[in-house]
Design a protein with these regions (language model features):
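Short, charge-rich amphipathic interface segments used for partner binding and complex assembly
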Residues: 24-62
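N-terminal acidic leader/helix
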Residues: 1-30, 62
Length: 64
């Protein structure tokens, strides 16, 4: 998945909010981690403020 596509999908999850969407965001970040590494995940968390919205912190590892 491209980072642009990941950003697009994460914005949808942010707009809907809720616990299920937090889990979806974690799955998207796991895919980003597998393809682009932890730095890309941390950048998305910072850029989209996922720490405030879903309590997802920089440095967290996402795997599936």
């Amino acid at each position: 998945m491209t980072l642009a596509r990941a950003t697009e999908l994460l914005k949808v999850q942010i707009d809907m909010g809720g616990e299920y969407n937090r889990n979806s965001a974690k799955m998207i970040l796991a895919d980003v981690s597998n393809e682009h590494g932890q730095a890309a995940v941390d950048q998305l968390i910072r850029t989209l403020k996922l720490d405030d919205i879903f309590d997802l912190k920089e440095g967290m590892k996402f795997r599936f």
